[in-house]
């Protein structure tokens, strides 16, 4: 015969041993919140948020103060370094300025000494190049200083023409050119010194009138003599 559930539970409870320190009071069941509790919790939440915001702002303020102090320290350090560099630069500039002034003075002294040496050299050259007249007393006649007159030049020209006419008159009339054979023409030209006519020419005794100036193109006698020449006279016809 089957046993019911109630019987089974009753038998099991009778068989179980319940400890003495067993918690008989159970916790209360979750109940609904009242309006006062909700308002209190809202106020607590607002205060908690405000406290967190204040802490974050204070943290940022402290960090900003730290950064400002650090920046000021770095600026002071940089200014001190810049002042030292400026002092060093000023010292270097003063040294370079002094060196430049010294070199400039030296260059000016060199230019002045060079100009003085050039002036002395130029004066010495000019004194050596100047002409110093000799102390000898040279007396010159006034006749030598005066130019020749036209009359003296005309008289000299007449004497020269008379001398030329005298030379031409002394030439003998029997002097004739030697006959040159056509076959021995080269021998006669090759040995001109063997001909007695060449001796007369060397002695300024020409067979024609020497008074005619062939180079003077204004002389009508020279022009007529030049016009009388023909090209056929210079060629030998066979």
Swiss-Prot record:
The keyword Nucleus applies. It comes from the Eukaryota. Pfam families: bZIP_2. GO terms for biological process: endoplasmic reticulum unfolded protein response; meiotic cell cycle; negative regulation of transcription by RNA polymerase II; positive regulation of transcription by RNA polymerase II; response to endoplasmic reticulum stress. PROSITE patterns: BZIP_BASIC. It is found in: Nucleus. Residues 39-102 form the bZIP domain. Residues 7-24 have a biased composition (Polar residues). Residues 41-61 are annotated as: Basic motif. Keywords: Activator, DNA-binding, Nucleus, Transcription, Transcription regulation, Unfolded protein response. The keyword Transcription regulation applies. One of its GO terms (molecular function) is DNA binding. Residues 1-39, 115-152 are annotated as: Disordered. Residues 67-74 are annotated as: Leucine-zipper. GO terms for cellular component: nucleus. Homodimer. PANTHER family: TRANSCRIPTIONAL ACTIVATOR HAC1. Belongs to the bZIP family. Transcriptional activator involved in the unfolded protein response (UPR) pathway. Recognizes and binds to the UPR element (UPRE) in the promoter of UPR-regulated genes such as KAR2, PDI1, EUG1 and FKB2. Increases the synthesis of endoplasmic reticulum-resident proteins required for protein folding as well as components of the secretory pathway. This is Transcriptional activator HAC1. The lineage of its organism: Eukaryota, Fungi, Dikarya, Ascomycota, Saccharomycotina.
């Amino acid at each position: 015969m089957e046993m019911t559930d109630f019987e089974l539970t009753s038998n099991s409870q009778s068989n179980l041993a319940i400890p003495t320190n067993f918690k008989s009071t159970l916790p209360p069941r979750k109940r609904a919140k009242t309006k006062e509790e909700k308002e209190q919790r809202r106020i607590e939440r607002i205060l908690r948020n405000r406290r967190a915001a204040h802490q974050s702002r204070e943290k940022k303020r402290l960090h900003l103060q730290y950064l400002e102090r650090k920046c000021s320290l770095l600026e002071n350090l940089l200014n001190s370094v810049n002042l030292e560099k400026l002092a060093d630069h000023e010292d270097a500039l003063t040294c370079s300025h002094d060196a430049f002034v010294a070199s400039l003075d030296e260059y000016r002294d060199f230019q002045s000494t060079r100009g003085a040496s050039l002036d002395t050299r130029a004066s010495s050259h000019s004194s050596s190049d100047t002409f110093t007249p000799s102390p000898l007393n040279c007396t010159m006649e006034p006749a030598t200083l005066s130019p020749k007159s036209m009359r003296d030049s005309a008289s000299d020209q007449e004497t020269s023409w008379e001398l030329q006419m005298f030379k031409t008159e002394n030439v003998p009339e029997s002097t004739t050119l030697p006959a040159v054979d056509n076959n021995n023409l080269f021998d006669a030209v090759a040995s001109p010194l063997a001909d007695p006519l060449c001796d007369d020419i060397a002695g300024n005794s020409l067979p024609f009138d020497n008074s005619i100036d062939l180079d003077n193109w204004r002389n009508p006698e020279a022009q007529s003599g030049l016009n009388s020449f023909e090209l056929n006279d210079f060629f030998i016809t066979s």
